[in-house]
């Protein structure tokens, strides 16, 4: 299977989502899937069989990208989406694995290229934005609407916990597969 994995974070870094992405890549590699990963310009190299990592251009003015919403991530996401568009226009993919906010990129790619996607959901972005930036509260319904669109159009939504799965049930996803975080007592490399 040819898979495009959108990883909107520095990869690899020894923290949360990049660790989860590394575990996913290890599993897909062992299964023999061919995976193209698009990620940010920062992060250390990790090599797996059948996996090709594509990085956005080196944005020297952007460094130390932290988890959560930020202008740095927003700029990097624009470059990530452009790179995804270029790759999808050159190569056929069977599936897109969209991590966090890249689900909106995957939704657009689905509409234009008919590629189904799975939504790797670590949090409710609508809730996260409103909690972090209270001035956005009046726009909560807009964020919820786009989250609903992303959930409804996903082939599968993979939230990290039952509480998150419960919070998206109202959006009527096609299929939900809760994939909880795992113990990381062993080395990933």
Where are these regions (language model features)?
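Membrane-proximal helix-turn-helix segments that form the acceptor-binding/catalytic region
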Residues: 23, 82-89, 104, 108-112, ...
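A short, charged, and often flexible helix/loop element on the N-terminal side
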Residues: 52-82, 132-135
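Nucleotide-sugar donor phosphate/pyrophosphate-binding loop at the beta->alpha transition
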Residues: 78, 116, 126-149, 185-187
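Donor nucleotide-sugar binding/catalytic pocket of nucleotide-sugar-dependent glycosyltransferases
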Residues: 39, 54-57, 140, 144-189
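Structural motif
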Residues: 94-95, 156
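N-terminal beta-loop-helix "entrance" segment that forms/cooperates
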Residues: 44-53
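N-terminal subdomain of nucleotide-sugar transferases
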Residues: 1-44, 156, 176, 180
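An aromatic- and histidine-rich active-site surface loop
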Residues: 14, 77-81, 95-127, 162
């Amino acid at each position: 299977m040819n898979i495009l994995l959108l990883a909107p974070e520095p990869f690899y870094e020894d923290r949360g989502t990049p660790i989860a992405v590394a575990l996913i890549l290890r599993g897909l590699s062992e299964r023999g899937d061919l995976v193209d990963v698009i990620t940010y310009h920062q992060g250390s190299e990790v090599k797996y069989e059948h996996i090709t990592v594509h990085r956005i251009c080196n944005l020297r003015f952007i460094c130390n990208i932290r988890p959560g919403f930020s202008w740095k991530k927003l700029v990097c996401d624009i470059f990530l989406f452009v790179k995804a568009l270029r790759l999808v226009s050159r190569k056929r993919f069977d599936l897109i694995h969209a991590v966090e906010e890249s689900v909106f990129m995957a939704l657009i790619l689905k509409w234009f290229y008919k590629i189904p996607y799975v939504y790797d959901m670590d949090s409710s972005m609508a809730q996260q934005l409103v909690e972090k930036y209270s001035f956005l509260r009046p726009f909560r319904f807009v964020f919820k609407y786009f989250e609903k669109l992303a959930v409804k159009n996903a082939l599968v939504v993979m939230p990290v916990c039952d509480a998150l799965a419960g919070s998206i049930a109202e959006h009527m996803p096609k299929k939900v597969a809760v994939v909880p975080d795992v113990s990381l007592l062993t080395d990933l490399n």
